[in-house]
Amino acid sequence: MEWRVRQSKNAEEEIANAKHPAIRHIKFPHRPADNPQADIPSDGWKVCGPDTVAEFTAVGYYFGRFLHKELDVPIGLLGCNWGGTRIEPWTPPAGFRAVPKLANIAGTLDQFPSRRGNGTIDHQTPLALYNGMVAPVIPYGIRGAIWYQGESNNGEGMLY
């Protein structure tokens, strides 16, 4: 999901033809947190155009473009992603409690996210990215999400 339009196949053509003012994108900074955050620092919403689309999430852009064409409604893309992360940092507390095989994590959530010796929060620990990047948008009317777990939890698919 962190793959950008500029990295896509036929990127130059896509960028030149990206004239979709009803599609907007906001990029969330990588921000692990030890407690749920109330807001997201950002540069604001970017209107989809040849001068902005190169930095949009590619999967989000292509999906959003399809939805806009099919539904004729404005599309807001939230670039909330961090390549190479496991699922645990993105999972809310209720997610751990809902899966019996994750009871070992659910019982120790008060210990997470953990801080490193230098005081920073390890972005791969449970709750870290949920707290810093997902929790701030929970109150808003989000109609759907695209989730790609990738290979960071390879071999654990039956667990979740």
What are these regions (language model features)?
Residues 1-160:
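Cell-envelope and extracellular/periplasmic
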